[in-house]
């Protein structure tokens, strides 16, 4: 599969060929149909968040596959996967937690500090395929366009 990975802060993304992920356990493989570019993708690419008052937070690293505003089609499901079928077209909720910390255990994965957020801690949507840990992170887009649905994965589902 083709993905686009970060190289150096502010540098060009590198086109990288790799194997298409194969689902394990409850994982779901989604083929990208649309992926938004969020302002945080720009920060991760540039390697720094401007915190204001001349303060910055260094972020990002070489080899990241950015993109957390994901919309795609389910193309494979793991043997333990339930709730997703091949051919389903879904928005992917990217704020995936570790599953073990206090935030995750009370159902607040979006507040998980270690986290496994797609496009940040795990490979994201700037690729042909993305591995989603469980079908619970997939949502129907309703009647909006594919490209608009992708942008809902960040601000729309967390609002």
Language model features by range: what are they?
Residues 36, 46, 134:
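Short, small-residue-rich loop/turn micro-motifs
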Residues 9, 33, 75-80, 109, ...:
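Short loop segments at secondary-structure junctions
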Residues 3-4, 90, 130:
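Well-ordered beta-strand positions enriched in small/hydrophobic/aromatic, beta-favoring residues
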Residues 14, 24, 86, 125-126, ...:
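A generic structural signal for well-ordered coil/turn residues at beta-strand boundaries
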Residues 21-35, 50-102, 142-144:
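Glycine-rich beta-strand-centered segment in the early N-terminal region that forms part
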Residues 3-22, 39-76, 112-121:
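N-terminal glycine-rich cofactor-binding segment
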Residues 56-68, 98-159:
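NAD(P)H dinucleotide-binding glycine-rich loop of Rossmann-like/cofactor-binding domains
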């Amino acid at each position: 599969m083709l993905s686009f990975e970060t190289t150096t802060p502010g540098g060009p993304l590198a086109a990288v060929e790799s194997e298409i992920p194969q689902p394990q356990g409850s994982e779901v493989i989604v083929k990208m149909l649309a992926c938004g570019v969020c302002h945080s993708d720009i920060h991760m690419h540039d390697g720094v968040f401007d915190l204001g008052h001349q303060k910055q937070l260094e972020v990002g690293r070489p080899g990241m596959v950015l993109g957390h505003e994901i919309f795609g089609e389910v193309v494979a499901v793991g043997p333990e996967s339930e709730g997703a079928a091949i051919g389903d077209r879904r928005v992917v909720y990217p704020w995936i937690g570790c599953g073990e910390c206090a935030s995750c255990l009370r159902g607040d994965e979006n507040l998980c500090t270690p986290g496994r957020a797609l496009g940040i801690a795990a490979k994201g949507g700037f690729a042909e395929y993305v591995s989603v840990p469980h079908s619970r992170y997939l949502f129907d887009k309703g009647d909006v366009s594919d490209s608009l649905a992708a942008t809902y994965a960040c601000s729309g589902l967390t609002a």
